[in-house]
Amino acid sequence: MKELGLKSYRFSVSWPRVISQDGKVNPKGLEFYSNLVDELIKNGIEPLVTLYHWDLPLWQYKKGGWLKKDIIDDFAFYVKAVVEALSDRVTYWITFNEPSCFLMNGYMQGVHAPFKHRYLALPKFTKIFMLTNRRAVETIRKYAKKKPLIGLSFASGAFIPNDESDPKSVEEAYNKSFNVTMGTMNNRWW
């Protein structure tokens, strides 16, 4: 990565590798990520940590996953463990990678795990997700050892105008990129 000239590197921490089924922190899991952060910094590469990239622990799934409020406290416990281990060296935190994908595709369209078709559950899992994200942000701010910069990573697409000199073509590309992609794929709720 250093030879390629990368200035930053985004990676995801695996919740099931950090928190065991019995709710205990796995020191070896955290050590792996701590070593990764050290190596990145040693090579002049800024670490960007993603806390959730669709890897719901099996034990959490069995408790109900994104349809049960238990996930709010469980995720906050995981976030606290990661932040306490890495925040002395990490500034950039992404709470969730592409929430529309794991929620809409997993719980409505059934094309991603857990392959559910629960259209009527949309308000419920959306609310639980938003509360979980809020708690994650609060947890990062509370336990971070240096001032954190926090955000979400959204799924999106980019459209290029057919003719960059034509304002109508530029506007059409913009609308497809932001109003359709960001509005439909990510839903204004996120």
Predicted regions and their residues:
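Non-catalytic scaffold segments within catalytic domains of secreted glycoside hydrolases
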Residues: K2-K7, P16-W190
